[in-house]
Amino acid sequence: MKKNIQRWIPAAVVPVVIATAAIAVPAVANASPSLPEKSPQQLLELVADSAGTPFSGTITQTTALGLPDVSSLAPTAGGDSASSALELITGSHTARVFVGGATTQRVQVLDGFAERDAIRNGDDLWLYDSDAKEATHVTAPADGLPDAPAVTPGEAAAKLLAAVDTSTTVEVVDTARVAGRSAYELRLTPRDADTLVGSVVLSVDAETGVPLGVAVTAKGQSDPAFSVRFSKISFDTPDANLFDFTPASDVTVEEESVDPAKTPDAAAIATPKPTVVGDGWDAVVVFPAGVPLTDPMIDQLTTKVDGGRVLATSLVSAYLADDGRVLVGAVTPEALQAVAAQ
């Protein structure tokens, strides 16, 4: 993908941290509301039934993985992808989200006076960077467009709930006020002893079932390691004009198209796919050797070990092997090295 797309869907280690580790919850300032009792199964069904609910709102992401805040650092030459990915998992970020339906969504990430937009409207996907004055327009059938990263609490919750199985204890633990709404709090606790994840808490809107916040807390910690929550939300259907995008005359536009019926070339067919070792919360994703990770920031954030380099955080670890493989999981670096040695 081109570099402005990579600012949204980077192709290195860090996006897997977001996808694998998932996301966080709010501290509740208001008194807990009194709500009718619901079982975990009833709440899971409520969340599932909320898919496609129109809404708009402001979300705040806060990360405390033990990494330095790199948001003020300029991307290094040739390192836009890694630098932008690292920005997303350090410090705090604010975004505005608009969902009109299954094929109309807009996410607007605010970076000071600049913004990055991802706008999907049917068969059209626009990726816009106001600072770089660049936009990419992708056209494809709705089911042929690439999946967006897990940005909102709902998207993060969907990934987590899809993975709920016998490796997880699920319980309703409390009620809360989130973005002015009454919510149930559903806690997922891993049974796997080797995972770094202590618990995950979902804040579920009591009326609509839309997830308002998701929180992941690492073992041995009391505060979430990664959090995203709504500070404002409205369930009025957003104006259709919000999903129309016309770039300004000074914006460089790159046109791309995706044809699902097109036969992939030999190189695409031969591209090795990631594999998963183990299952449950201590599963490890192994990415085969690919393009070398050369961004100097990678060296700043990793530690040299036998056979490669490791990125260790409170919630997730990555092992960059000298042979080009990348291993990621919510486990210790030593566990990743053991998998790499198999």
Name each model-derived stretch:
Residues 242-325, 330-341:
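Accessory, solvent-exposed terminal regions and/or long lumenal/extracellular loops of proteins
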